[in-house]
Amino acid sequence: MAGEAQHADLAGGWLLPEPAPREAICTRSIVCRSFRRNDGLIDIDGRFIDTRPFEYDSDFRGPCPAGSALHHMQLRLSVDRSRHIQALASAMPATPYEGCAEVNPNFQRVVGLSIGRGFRKALRERLGGVEGCTHVLALLDVMAAAAVQAFASSNYAPRRPSQPEPVRVWKLEALVDTCHSYRTGGEVMQRLLAKP
């Protein structure tokens, strides 16, 4: 399918029931990759892409080839060990309207925010409505969740001698009742809370 090279592998691995006869009309992918830096910060690179597998005419962009990106937003968050965003880089390689990229400087308003309770509300206070971009907000929500995994993964990843020891930056108690596996009294929480 045209444009699929921009997305993660979409062909294999599906365990869903066989679908009814259908044809693809849009693919949205949100991909995050996390990296541990030598200075102890964690970088989360995020990419949001929408493509259509057919050629179409846009009232604002003219002819759009099959597989071309309607939306393509990229962000990098640099987060310290206390979960504070230290830096943000942004790019908008493809937008549906010429003026979309005018809000790019506004994304710097997330620098200094802490990823944790209240993060989504703080994002919307700074970047909601005409101050931001719906798609960038969606990407930031996913990147915040990716940051949680990045900090957890950093506890298991091999370290070079120059890198600091990982610290647990998430209180296990904050996970209680956030999903079925973390339910109060469940086996997973009992085992996690019993660890020193």
Regions found by a protein language model. Give the residues of each.
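Active-site- and interface-proximal helix/loop "cap" or "latch" segments in soluble metabolic
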Residues: 2-3, 50-196
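Compositionally biased, low-complexity repeat tracts
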Residues: 8-9, 42, 181-182
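Charged, compositionally biased non-catalytic regions
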Residues: 1-13
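N-terminal intrinsically disordered, cationic/polar leader segments
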Residues: 17-44, 49-58, 70-72
